């Protein structure tokens, strides 16, 4: 995967949150908190992200996405001919919805995983698609992008 995407994801995925508290005397105190998954929840999420070569946590289902970003991820995968992947509707389970955000240290849904490794959300997948990196990543998974066949036909 392109190192720019990895470093961007690493920078954005910090699970340490800084907060400020205002006291009655007007002073502000700063604190930090780290979000943690329970070990049972983390193990379950680890199993979920490794269920298939491509796993998507989204709002809705591939047949009926419930937000524009989830729909964009489905459409990008569909353009590449990736129709066989595990998907989880986070609207069905609040624990999964919050747990996956903590697990990946990524604040938004949808979330895409390749071979159990967090790739990113809609923005990262779109950048990978536009740059051609997604074709390469799919090849590493043993998935031939349908866009390669379209390129051959157009020549």
From Swiss-Prot:
Q: Which residues form the Glutaredoxin domain?
A: 42-145
What is an annotated GO biological process for this record, any one? iron-sulfur cluster assembly
Q: Does the keyword Magnesium apply?
A: no
- Highest taxon of the source? Eukaryota
Q: What happens when the gene is disrupted?
A: Lethal between 7 and 10 dpf. Embryos show hypochromia, and circulating blood cells are pale due to a defect in hemoglobin biosynthesis.
> Which locations, inside or outside the cell, does it occupy?
Mitochondrion
Instruction: Give the stretch annotated as transit peptide in the record, renumbered to this chain.
Output: 1-14
Record flagged with keyword Ubl conjugation: no
InterPro entries (UniProt xref): Glutaredoxin, GRX_PICOT-like, Monothiol_GRX-rel, Thioredoxin-like_sf
The UniProt annotation places [2Fe-2S] cluster binding at 67
Q: Where are the transmembrane segments?
A: none
The UniProt GO MF terms for this protein read: 2 iron, 2 sulfur cluster binding; metal ion binding
Its annotated function is as follows: Monothiol glutaredoxin involved in mitochondrial iron-sulfur (Fe/S) cluster transfer. Receives iron-sulfur clusters from scaffold protein ISCU and mediates their transfer to apoproteins, to the 4Fe/FS cluster biosynthesis machinery, or export from mitochondrion. Required for normal hemoglobin biosynthesis.
Assembly and oligomerization: Homodimer.
Q: What is this protein called?
A: Glutaredoxin-related protein 5, mitochondrial
Q: Which organism is it from?
A: Danio rerio (Zebrafish)
Instruction: Show the taxonomic lineage.
Output: Eukaryota, Metazoa, Chordata, Craniata, Vertebrata
Q: Which gene encodes it?
A: glrx5
């Amino acid at each position: 995967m392109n190192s720019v995407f990895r470093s961007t994801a690493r920078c954005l995925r910090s699970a340490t949150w800084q907060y400020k508290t205002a006291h009655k005397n007007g002073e502000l105190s700063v604190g930090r908190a780290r979000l943690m998954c329970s070990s049972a929840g983390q193990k379950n999420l680890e199993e979920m992200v490794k269920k298939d070569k491509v796993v998507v946590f989204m709002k809705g289902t591939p047949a009926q996405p419930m937000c524009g970003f989830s729909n964009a991820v489905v459409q990008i995968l569909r353009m590449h001919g990736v129709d066989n992947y595990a998907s989880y509707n986070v609207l069905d389970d609040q624990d999964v919805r919050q747990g996956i955000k903590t697990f990946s240290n990524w604040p938004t849904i949808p979330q895409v995983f390749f071979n159990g490794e967090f790739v990113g959300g809609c923005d990262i997948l779109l950048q990978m698609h536009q740059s051609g990196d997604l074709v390469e990543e799919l090849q590493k998974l043993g998935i031939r992008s349908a866009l390669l066949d379209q390129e051959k036909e157009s020549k």
